[in-house]
Amino acid sequence: MTNTILDTYSSRRKPRRIGILTSGGDAPGMNGAIRAVVRTAIQNGCEAWAIHEGYEGLIQGGAMMHPLYWEDVRGFLSRGGTLIGSVRCDRFREREGRLQAARNMVLFGIDALVVCGGDGSLTGADLFRSEWPELLNELVSTGVLTVAQVAPHQNLNIVGLLGSIDNDFSGTDATIGCYSALTRICEAVDAVFDTASSHRRGFVVEVMGRHCGWLALMAAIATGADWLFIPERPPRDGWEDDMCSIITKNRNRGKRRTIVILAEGAQDSNLDRISSSAVKDVLSKRLGLDTRVTVLGHIQRGGSPCAYDRWLSTLQGIHAVKAVLSMTPESPSPVVIIQENRIRTSSLAETVALTKEANASMHAKEFEKAATLRDPEFMEYHSAYRHLNTSDHPKMVLPEDKRMRVAIIHVGAPAAGMNPATRAVVAYCLTRGHTPIAIHNGFPGLCRHHDDTPGSVREMHWLESGDWINDGGSDIGTNAGLPLDDIETTAQCFERYKFDALFVIGGFEAFTAVSQLRKARKQYLAFRIPLVLLPASMSNNVPGTEYSLGSDTSLNTLVYFCDVVRQSASSSGHSVFVVEAQGAEYQATAAALAAGAMTVYTPERGITLQSLSNDIEYLRQQFSKDHGANRSGKLIIRNDQTSTIYSTTEIANIIKHEAKNRFDAQGVVPGHFQQGGKVSPIDRIRAFRLAVKCMEHLETFAGQSPEEIMNDENSATVISIKQSRILLLPMGGPTGVEATDTDWKRQRPKTQNWLEIQEAVDSLSGRSSLYAIPN
């Protein structure tokens, strides 16, 4: 392509051109970011340009840089890696390379860049912007470009997206790709469980993460690993003895497998590397364990992104374009982050500087400082893991007068996360000297079968729940029955078995149960004990919290189902699938965003004949312009409570009838499949942390009188995730959750923090207010 032809790109006044590139190591979710940037740019009257192979494409120019249109990014959401390529470009580190990149930016008329990558990629981006005026001056002074060519491009806007499986950036809760990588690790370790147990083997599993131990720490928690090595927390001298002691105790309890998780950057306090082979040798020689080493390697980067990475990359991509359009010449380059569970922007330079400071702190042996600069929850997770992994330690056991008989009960529909949470409660209780007691099959089980043999009220032991780390459903049984169904017998059982605290896990029914017990304290002395609710519901509808256990597992299951259905729809050509989703509005809306659905029908929105007619007309427009294009199948998600008239089947039939043979439509119902199988890593690690927090709260009431407990509003609480904060909120009182955030009629919170997602679903499908594809 000649300079004369290229000149036309900058000489004609066109809409703003926003370039998107991915650089450094690939991460699942990058394609979701590309899709969001492209379609949001088009929605805002801009052009989106792909720059292939990262900064190398920016330097080479030519065919490496081209526009992306609306349909070009169809199907991107479910694809792993990056479809526009990524390389580690040494040439961009040199000024000559950046000079060539600036030349191509001007010639192609691109005046804004969205860069998705790691710290090296974003450091290069910030340097590129700071040098931009000098680079243009040099290109003009050397005759490479003319004053007229560079005049429209005096300012360069750059926005960063954090794409890294390592989650090694400071100041953000998560990076694009980190939870998908964690999912790959957990899938691999879950598979190792079977062979390890069969042969009573030990496995040392080495995971990626460079100098950051986030992946290793979360994998250790999510798989119940016996021991953990991370660079931020090097083991003390003599770690071999400590590790062997813990593993020996676990083996003596009857555990058949041993799992050790080791970060690839693991080191001791002298910064000497701890290798997986060295750990294997310790286990083999000292304990005589048949031990294997499994280095997961690049398998962690691959595969389809999990639901979290899909919606994170999508919302951050949307935010990146908005940031570009709102920037002034004086604005510092921003980076889009997620902080306190909200999408925000921060200073790119400061974020990179803090990340480098964390790495420098480790090299300086300032491990405490390095750990505090990681993910905000890093320290708490590590502390909780360490405490629960050192059961029988004399320093952890409480005095006799502080020990409690803690009853554990599951209430409501089964939800993934119930078992891992129960496992964590049991482990914590045994570590601290408490007695964990399982109430089987909910309140009806307590009332009807506590006298049976075996009874429904049974003490739990360490080995009994040891393998529940990834089990879905409820192994102690759950039931929707409530205390008021038989309040007299419930009180008698509480008194008979001398419960000192009640740990309730479940959804809105569990919330109702705790409310009933709290209100019945005036009549029944047995209920004057601390009560705590850990929300677990695929519907994510427990008042007071933004997150319930099981909702992530269910969402991933539904998204996988939608991916398979979409594949069928696309293979068949012009097909529409209407998928019915359980789990209140949250599941349908979040799945629509993560699966790239055309639209979502929820009770909040409702559905009318007019809105359905508009959507059918939109489908006609879409299919008429496809002309046999690939991946042309469409997806509509409908919550099962949306309408009693317009059922999933009815909607599909109406669409099919109105299509008049131009396209097909079918309704599909995943049903209870949506509850999921194995628990997702996010549900596992949150179950662990929330269970520990709940137990720490219950311990504060040890030794108090029944009257003191009854008069303390914090003695009946629900644990809540609000933004990224974990709070224990009182159920009762004028400012309690029951009064301020409970919609009893609809069985959900009054505050719905995820409703803004619906706008993103419509925007990225092209189904905006006029139901027309943007030109």
UniProtKB/Swiss-Prot annotation:
Is Magnesium included in the keywords of this UniProt record?
Answer: yes
What is this enzyme's EC? Answer: 2.7.1.11
Pathway given for this chain reads: Carbohydrate degradation; glycolysis; D-glyceraldehyde 3-phosphate and glycerone phosphate from D-glucose: step 3/4
Q: Where in the cell is it found?
A: Cytoplasm
Q: Name one GO biological process term.
A: canonical glycolysis
Region entry C-terminal regulatory PFK domain 2, spans = 405-775
Read off the Pfam families from this record.
Answer: PFK
State if Ligase is listed as a keyword: no
Classification via PROSITE patterns? PHOSPHOFRUCTOKINASE (PS00433)
Chain spans, region N-terminal catalytic PFK domain 1: 1-390
Q: Which residues bind substrate?
A: S164, I165, D166, R201, M208, G209, R210, E264, R292, H298, I299, Q300, R301
Tell me the keywords, alphabetical order.
Allosteric enzyme, ATP-binding, Cytoplasm, Glycolysis, Kinase, Magnesium, Metal-binding, Nucleotide-binding, Transferase
Regulation of catalytic or functional activity? Allosterically activated by ADP, AMP, or fructose 2,6-bisphosphate, and allosterically inhibited by ATP or citrate.
Q: Which residues bind beta-D-fructose 2,6-bisphosphate?
A: S537, M538, S539, N540, N541, Q582, G583, A584, D640, H672, F673, Q674, Q675
Q: Where does Mg(2+) bind?
A: D119
Where is ATP bound in this sequence?
Answer: G25, R88, C89, G118, D119, G120, S121
One Gene Ontology cellular component: mitochondrion
Task: Please name the GO terms that the record assigns under molecular function.
Answer: 6-phosphofructokinase activity; AMP binding; ATP binding; fructose-6-phosphate binding; identical protein binding; metal ion binding; monosaccharide binding
Write down the required cofactor(s): Mg(2+)
Q: Which residues form the active site?
A: D166
**PANTHER family, per the entry:** ATP-DEPENDENT 6-PHOSPHOFRUCTOKINASE (PTHR13697:SF4), PHOSPHOFRUCTOKINASE (PTHR13697)
Q: What does this protein do?
A: Catalyzes the phosphorylation of D-fructose 6-phosphate to fructose 1,6-bisphosphate by ATP, the first committing step of glycolysis.
Family per similarity comment: Belongs to the phosphofructokinase type A (PFKA) family. ATP-dependent PFK group I subfamily. Eukaryotic two domain clade 'E' sub-subfamily.
Quaternary structure per UniProt? Homotetramer.
Q: What is this protein called?
A: ATP-dependent 6-phosphofructokinase 2
Q: Which source organism does the UniProt entry give?
A: Aspergillus oryzae (strain ATCC 42149 / RIB 40) (Yellow koji mold)
